[in-house]
Amino acid sequence: MSLVYMNTALAFSISMLGLLMYRAHLMSSLLCLEGMMLSLFTLGAITILTTHFTLANMLPIVLLVFAACEAAVGLSLLVMVSNTYGADFVQNLNLLQC
């Protein structure tokens, strides 16, 4: 395994570990999800460039578009929750609290 792949896998693992550990605030969860998506984008782009697989050149761009949509939906959810409850705690998102 080359150093680039190992660094990208390490970035993904650290982001996932951050997502599992820092679940109290919605903003930290969104940042960890964004780090995971960016490491997947980097891994996909490097893999496609090293294998010269020209048919899949659009795949990292599609993944980046999905990451941007995820970030937009997450930030709108963050604004809605902070306006409604006054804080961005994830425990406020429980649907059973009516």
Curated annotation (Swiss-Prot):
Keyword Ribonucleoprotein on entry: no
EC number from the UniProt entry: 7.1.1.2
Annotated localization: Mitochondrion inner membrane
Catalysed conversion reaction: a ubiquinone + NADH + 5 H(+)(in) = a ubiquinol + NAD(+) + 4 H(+)(out)
Membrane topology qualifier: Multi-pass membrane protein
Disulfide bonding pattern of the chain: none
Enzyme class: translocase
Gene3D superfamilies named among the record's database cross-references: 1.10.287.3510
Keywords in alphabetical order: Electron transport, Membrane, Mitochondrion, Mitochondrion inner membrane, NAD, Respiratory chain, Translocase, Transmembrane, Transmembrane helix, Transport, Ubiquinone
Keyword Transmembrane helix included in the entry's annotation: yes
Gene Ontology cellular-component annotations: mitochondrial inner membrane; respiratory chain complex I
Molecular function terms from GO: NADH dehydrogenase (ubiquinone) activity
InterPro entries, alphabetized: NADH_UbQ_OxRdtase_chain4L/K, NUOK/Mnh_C1-like
Role of this protein: Core subunit of the mitochondrial membrane respiratory chain NADH dehydrogenase (Complex I) which catalyzes electron transfer from NADH through the respiratory chain, using ubiquinone as an electron acceptor. Part of the enzyme membrane arm which is embedded in the lipid bilayer and involved in proton translocation.
Family according to the record: Belongs to the complex I subunit 4L family.
PANTHER family cross-referenced by the UniProt entry: NADH-UBIQUINONE OXIDOREDUCTASE CHAIN 4L, NADH-UBIQUINONE OXIDOREDUCTASE SUBUNIT ND4L
Assembly behavior: Core subunit of respiratory chain NADH dehydrogenase (Complex I) which is composed of 45 different subunits.
Protein name in the entry: NADH-ubiquinone oxidoreductase chain 4L
Organism of origin: Crocidura russula
Record lineage: Eukaryota, Metazoa, Chordata, Craniata, Vertebrata
